[in-house]
Amino acid sequence: MGLVCFPDTQDKIPSIPVHLTRVGVTGVKKLLKIEREGRRPIILLPTFDAFVDLPSKQRGIHMSRNPEAISDVLEEVVENNALELESLCAEIVNELLKKHRYARRAEVSMNSDFMFMKRSPVTRRKSQEMTKIMADAIGYRDDDGIVIRKMIGAEVVGMTVCPCAQESVREASRQKLLEFLDDETVERVLDCVSFASHNQSGRGMIMIEVPEDQTIRAEKLIDIIESSMSSPVYELLKRPDENAVVMSAHENPMFVEDCVRNMVHRIVSEYPHLPDDTIVTVRQINEESIHRHNAFAEKVATMGELRYEIEELNGAGS
């Protein structure tokens, strides 16, 4: 007995002919092993979202083709062992547009936990640290074929210390010390001690567009984000480490705005070779300890715009 030919309901004309921007699947979980020459492979458990647009004259997309496209590309990656995460998403976008001939746009996003090793600042104890890495790709059909733009990113947790509250504590301490010390001694005392403040658990995020002939490593983005807050955080800290982290953070207080500007400055310094039209998104969310709300700051710009602000404007003001 042969296979039964079922009717293709998706190809019917919808009762309400409206174009849909994104239709697809979310939360597709996969196992991905990335081989590295001379080093241990990276094992990821990424989650994929995959979408195409839908013309107004078609009732539905062929939904099974989306997870099928993800699986097909991942199998190919396992065989070749050579593909960056953002390029992986771009390949899935390309496969989606092949499978959905009626679509003019496809979009794939991926996020995964990423483990890396880090040593504590004083005792040098090694521990596994977890962070998030992301990749996106968007493809369009035009008269010349398929145009794809891809991005790589990371999100890292760190620690921030509020400068405003710290200055208030410093001034209150000054007034207290002046009750029994002279001005010069008070200033000497204030200059050699750290002052209390309220802290935040900060989450920094960077997403950078990756031009076709360029490579941006997620590990470098992790470094940039960590170094842009008051202090990194660690899974394992002994007492000397804990003291060092707290002291270091309070010697380096930052607003949420400072963190974003620090990341922007480091991105401009680290990637002078990226084209001016490269899109960059930088975001910081600080989870407050003494408020019920959180603090947020963001910068979305091209590399050319960032370079102008950092180099031209700052140079003119110096």
Swiss-Prot record:
The record ties this protein, via InterPro entries, to: GTP_cyclohydrolase_FolE2/MptA (IPR003801), GTP_cyclohydrolase_MptA (IPR022840)
Q: What class of enzyme is it?
A: hydrolase
Known Pfam families for this protein? GCHY-1 (PF02649)
Q: Could you give the cofactor binding note from the entry?
A: Binds 1 Fe(2+) ion per subunit.
Do you know which NCBIfam families this protein is assigned to? GTP cyclohydrolase MptA
- Role description: Converts GTP to 7,8-dihydro-D-neopterin 2',3'-cyclic phosphate, the first intermediate in the biosynthesis of coenzyme methanopterin.
Query: Any idea what this protein is called?
Result: GTP cyclohydrolase MptA
Organism encoding this protein: Methanothermobacter thermautotrophicus (strain ATCC 29096 / DSM 1053 / JCM 10044 / NBRC 100330 / Delta H)
Q: Which gene encodes it?
A: mptA
